[in-house]
C-alpha cells in the first residue's frame, strides 16, 4: 500500500515502557503551517476514500500543519449556486471536468474535459468533505475552502448576451474547453461569490480562509502595451474577488496562490501585482508564495517575494512545490529546503511573512523532502543536514549504521542536490519533447549511495520502510541505466 511505503516512520523495536526524557519546548516562528496544492487533488487524491484521508490528516497533525487546503466537494456546492442562478442541471454538469481534472477546472483553465460528474459522485463528495473538515477542525486546523473566482458555464454566458465575457485560454485546449470569466464590474460577480460562500457555510459551517485564483497561468485579454488598462482591470478584479467573498462572510480572508506571479513573471511586474492588491485590506488577504524552489531551478529569476518587496504589506506564506505533476523520480534540493525559508524569515525585505508551507502537486514520493520541510516549519534557523539526516534515518528505519550515513551523504550530493520539474526515464523519451525533459542523476556517486544503502540489509531488514526504500532506490537506478 502506498501509504505504508511512504507516509510513516518506523516503530520497529518499540519498548514496552518508554524511558523518561527531559522536556524540550519547540516553538514555531510561523502563525500558519500550510500544506497541499490545488493540483494534489488531481494528481494524488481525487479517488481517495475517508480511510486514506484520515491517515493523511493524522500525518499533517503530527507535523504541526494547521492550514491545509480543503477543496473536496467544490462542484457540489457550485452546482447549487448555478441552479439558483437559473441554469439547468445538465448544463451545469457539462461545465465540470472528470474527477482527475477538477483542479484545473477550479482554476478556470479547463471545462468539460472527461466530464460530466454524476449525481452519486456529488453526494459522496459532500459526505467525504464533512468527514475531512470535521477531523481537521478537531485537530485545531483552519482549512482553506474554495471561493468563486469568476469563471462561469457556457450556459450562463449564453443567458446573458448583454455581458462582455472575457475569454481565457490555457494549455492549448480547444476553445470549447476554455474558460469564460465575468468582467469585474458586473453585479453578478458579487452575487455569485456571495451565494457560493453562503452555500458552502450552510453545508459545512463557518470558515475563515477562502481560496480564489482568477488568472493562474493565464493572461488577461488586454491590449499589448496598454499598461493603464491592464492595471485598472487588475485592480477591479482584486476588488471584486475580495468583496464577493466578504459579502458572504465579512470575517473571511481571501487566500490566493502566488505561483502565477513567478511563472508569468514578465506579465506580473511590480505595478501589475500592486494593482491587483491595491483595493484589498492588508489584513483580509494572504498570498501563498507557492514555489520558492522554481525561480532557481526552472524560471531563472529571483524568488517572487524578493521581486515583489515581500508582497507590498500583504500577509504571505513562504512555500515550495517539491513535486511537480505527481512525478516519482528522486529529486529535490535538500540544501535549499534546509536554508531558504530561514533566510527569508531574517530578511529585512520579507514584509509580513506569517507562514511556511509545502505544496506538492503529488504525494507518496521523496518522503525525505516532506519530512525536512515539516521540520523547517518549526524553526527560525537553517537545518544542518549532516546532523539531520542520521536522525531522519533512525526515525524512518530504526537505525543509521555508518554505511547508511554515507549513502545519504551521496544522495544529498547527487539526486537530492537539484530539482527538476519534468524528469524523464529513458523509456519516456522515445519521442522526445525537449522542452519537458530534465536531467536524472546516473552518476557513479549515486550508484555508490545505492550500494551503501543496500549493504545495511543485515541490520535493518526487519524495517518494512528500509525494505521498501531499498527496492525503490535499486529499481530506480536500474531503470535509469538499462530501460
Segments from the language model and where they lie:
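Catalytic-core regions of glycoside hydrolase
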Residues: 15-17, 36-40, 61, 66-412, ...
Amino acid at each position: 500500500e502506498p501509504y505504508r511505503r511512504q507516509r510513516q516512520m518506523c516503530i520497529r523495536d518499540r519498548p514496552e515502557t518508554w524511558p523518561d526524557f527531559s522536556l524540550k519546548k519547540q516553538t514555531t516562528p510561523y502563525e500558519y503551517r500550510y500544506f497541499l496544492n490545488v493540483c494534489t487533488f488531481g494528481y494524488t487524491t481525487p479517488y481517495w476514500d475517508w480511510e486514506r484521508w484520515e491517515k493523511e490528516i493524522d500525518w499533517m497533525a503530527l507535523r504541526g500543519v494547521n492550514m491545509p487546503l480543503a477543496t473536496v466537494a467544490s462542484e457540489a456546492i457550485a452546482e447549487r449556486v448555478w441552479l439558483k442562478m437559473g441554469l439547468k442541471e445538465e448544463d451545469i454538469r457539462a461545465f465540470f471536468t472528470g474527477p482527475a481534472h477538477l483542479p484545473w477546472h477550479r482554476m478556470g483553465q479547463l471545462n468539460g474535459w472527461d466530464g460530466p460528474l454524476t449525481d452519486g459522485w456529488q453526494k459522496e463528495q459532500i459526505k467525504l468533505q464533512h468527514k475531512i473538515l470535521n477531523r481537521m477542525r478537531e485537530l485545531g486546523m483552519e482549512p482553506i475552502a474554495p471561493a468563486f473566482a469568476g469563471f462561469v458555464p457556457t450556459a450562463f454566458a449564453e443567458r446573458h448576451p448583454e455581458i462582455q465575457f472575457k475569454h481565457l485560454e490555457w494549455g492549448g485546449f480547444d476553445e470549447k474547453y476554455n474558460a469564460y470569466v465575468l468582467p469585474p464590474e458586473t453585479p453578478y460577480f458579487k452575487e455569485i461569490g456571495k451565494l457560493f460562500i453562503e452555500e458552502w457555510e450552510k453545508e459545512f459551517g463557518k470558515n475563515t480562509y477562502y481560496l480564489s485564483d482568477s488568472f493562474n497561468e493565464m493572461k488577461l485579454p488586454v491590449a499589448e502595451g496598454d499598461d493603464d488598462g491592464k492595471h485598472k482591470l487588475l485592480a477591479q478584479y482584486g476588488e471584486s474577488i475580495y468583496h464577493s467573498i466578504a459579502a458572504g462572510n465579512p470575517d473571511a480572508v481571501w487566500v490566493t496562490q502566488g505561483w502565477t506571479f513567478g511563472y508569468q513573471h514578465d506579465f506580473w511586474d511590480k505595478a501589475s501585482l500592486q494593482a491587483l492588491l491595491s483595493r484589498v485590506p492588508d489584513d483580509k488577504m494572504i498570498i501563498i508564495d507557492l514555489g520558492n524552489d522554481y525561480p532557481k531551478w526552472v524560471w531563472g529569476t529571483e524568488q517572487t517575494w524578493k521581486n515583489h518587496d515581500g508582497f507590498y504589506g500583504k500577509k504571505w506564506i513562504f512555500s515550495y512545490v517539491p513535486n511537480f505533476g505527481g512525478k516519482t523520480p528522486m529529486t529535490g534540493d535538500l540544501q535549499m529546503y534546509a536554508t531558504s525559508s530561514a533566510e527569508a524569515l531574517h530578511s529585512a525585505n520579507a514584509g509580513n511573512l506569517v507562514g511556511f508551507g509545502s505544496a506538492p502537486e503529488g504525494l507518496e514520493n521523496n518522503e525525505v523532502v516532506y519530512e525536512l520541510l515539516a521540520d523547517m516549519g518549526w524553526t527560525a534557523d537553517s537545518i544542518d543536514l549532516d546532523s539531520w539526516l542520521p536522525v531522519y534515518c533512525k526515525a524512518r528505519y530504526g537505525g543509521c549504521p555508518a554505511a547508511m550515513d554515507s549513502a545519504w551523504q551521496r544522495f544529498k550530493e547527487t539526486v537530492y542536490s537539484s530539482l527538476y520539474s519534468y524528469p524523464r526515464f529513458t523509456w519516456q523519451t522515445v519521442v522526445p519533447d525537449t522542452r519537458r525533459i530534465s536531467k536524472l542523476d546516473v552518476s557513479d556517486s549515486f550508484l555508490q549511495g545505492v550500494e551503501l544503502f543496500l549493504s545495511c540489509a543485515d541490520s535493518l531488514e526487519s524495517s518494512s520502510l528500509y525494505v521498501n526504500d531499498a527496492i525503490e532506490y535499486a529499481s530506480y537506478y536500474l531503470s535509469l541505466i538499462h530501460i
